[in-house]
Amino acid sequence: MTRTQEPLPTVAAPKVGFISLGCPKALVDSERILTQLRAEGYEVAPNYEDAQAVIVNTCGFITPAVEESLSAIGEALDATGKVIVTGCLGERPEKILERHPKVAAITGSEAVDDVMAHVRELLPIELDPFTGLLPVAAPGMRQGDTLAPSVKLTPRHYAYVKIAEGCNHTCSFCIIPKLRGRQVSRDAGAVLYEAYRLIAGGTKELMIISQDTSAYGVDLRHRTSEFQGEQVRAHLIDLAEKLGEMGAWVRMHYVYPYPHVERIVELMSQGKILPYLDVPLQHASPAVLKRMRRPGAGKQLDTIRRWREICPELVIRSTFIVGFPGETEEDFQLLLDFLEEARLDRVGAFTYSDVEEADANALDGAIPEEVKQERLARFMEVAQRISREKLAEKVGRVLDVIIDEFNDDEGDEPGTRLIGRTKGDAPGIDGQVYLYAGDFAGQVKIGDIVQARIEDSDEYDLYGEVIHTPEWRPNVPLLGHFGKH
């Protein structure tokens, strides 16, 4: 006689909404929280209507970001009544409670465990007795150094890899050390295993991020850790060399111009990592840099010249602040002169505004808003001209382009028009390449790396046609069929 077993009743998983605001470093924190939610059996709701509670990962750096975060918290409260606030603004709970006293819980940044404790309290989950959960992290690993496959908030073909948290600088306009603490680096082995897993899953481009990437490992006294049976030092040079051996595009962000960065540029000249440096210069006037409490006054041009001698293909991006307190017309002219001489490839700028709790708020010499805007316009006029001239030099060349999206017109065969980026363009902040697929229409997929002939350019973008679709072969065994192109 055969006994049939009645099916066990299923329990619907609690649904949690999620809002991620701020920079790529905050995005990585969001990915870690979402990974833990999934690992513990929670479902991520696509909208407020389906959510039983909402997590808001906030930004608290500049005033507009604070206001955006507070507005998002309010919307989530109106929709669900249960909101957990985390991230940078969470380091200032009084700011949140003043506007939204009914939030369920507040944590700071890098607080996955705290966030999950509050989620469990708000939405207790009944685990299936026949299903076990493996830990996302192992004993001795830093929070966020995951073993399990993680949730990504970027397309499959690129990812942000955060190598350190916090900052040791005391820039007068910045409150990051107050929000995120002093620098805490991850062991090199943890970073490399994460990169290895990402590439094995089909990721072709890694953006290496932190507040001060050049200082990676200083707090660890550059100790070694294990990666595939080898001891690797927690130093940017060693890390970059190992990452470069994996065969993906490796892009360096937030690189301060310390002397050892020349070794990184040498790796770029050898083709091991992308010839791209995101360098936060902020200004060129020694007087303004001193008031900002920033390094590099008087040495920036010499450093850039040396880098370009080592790697002529190097693309340099930087960001500047215009209208800092005490900035004279002479100071601003020094900045314009620097821009003309340095001929940076990618430039961003914004006008100075007070940041709550920043030391710069107490500086005298506030610049009128109309003067700030006038200087910003002059700055961007120079920057756009230089960008237009530098991009025009690429016309006629064949460049590698990673495809981010389709851009088909109505009536086009699918995959006829593509948008991608060169090795000199990071997603979201730099230029794009608009391509006609030609004979390769319908064959190129998002995430493919193609070769394209550049036919035209403007201030920020390039235009061209696909001429070849080589197969992508990293030095990491791929999971599944991710190797085509």
Curated annotation (Swiss-Prot):
Domain TRAM positions: 392-468
A single cellular component GO annotation: cytosol
CC cofactor: [4Fe-4S] cluster
Residue numbers binding [4Fe-4S] cluster 2: C167, C171, C174
Cofactor mode of binding and number, as noted: Binds 2 [4Fe-4S] clusters. One cluster is coordinated with 3 cysteines and an exchangeable S-adenosyl-L-methionine.
Main location: cytoplasm
Top class in the EC scheme: transferase
Any Pfam family: Radical_SAM
Keyword Cytoplasm: yes
Residues the entry annotates as binding [4Fe-4S] cluster 1: C23, C59, C88
Single Gene Ontology BP annotation: tRNA modification
UniProt-listed Enzyme Commission number(s): 2.8.4.4
Localization terms from the record: Cytoplasm
One function term, GO molecular function aspect: protein methylthiotransferase activity
Residue ranges of every copy of the Radical SAM core domain listed in the record: 153-389
Keywords per UniProt: 4Fe-4S, Cytoplasm, Iron, Iron-sulfur, Metal-binding, S-adenosyl-L-methionine, Transferase
Ranges for domain MTTase N-terminal: 14-124
Reactions that this protein is recorded to catalyse: L-aspartate(89)-[ribosomal protein uS12]-hydrogen + (sulfur carrier)-SH + AH2 + 2 S-adenosyl-L-methionine = 3-methylsulfanyl-L-aspartate(89)-[ribosomal protein uS12]-hydrogen + (sulfur carrier)-H + 5'-deoxyadenosine + L-methionine + A + S-adenosyl-L-homocysteine + 2 H(+)
Protein role: Catalyzes the methylthiolation of an aspartic acid residue of ribosomal protein uS12.
HAMAP family reported in the protein's UniProt record: MTTase_RimO (MF_01865)
Protein name: Ribosomal protein uS12 methylthiotransferase RimO
Species name: Deinococcus geothermalis (strain DSM 11300 / CIP 105573 / AG-3a)
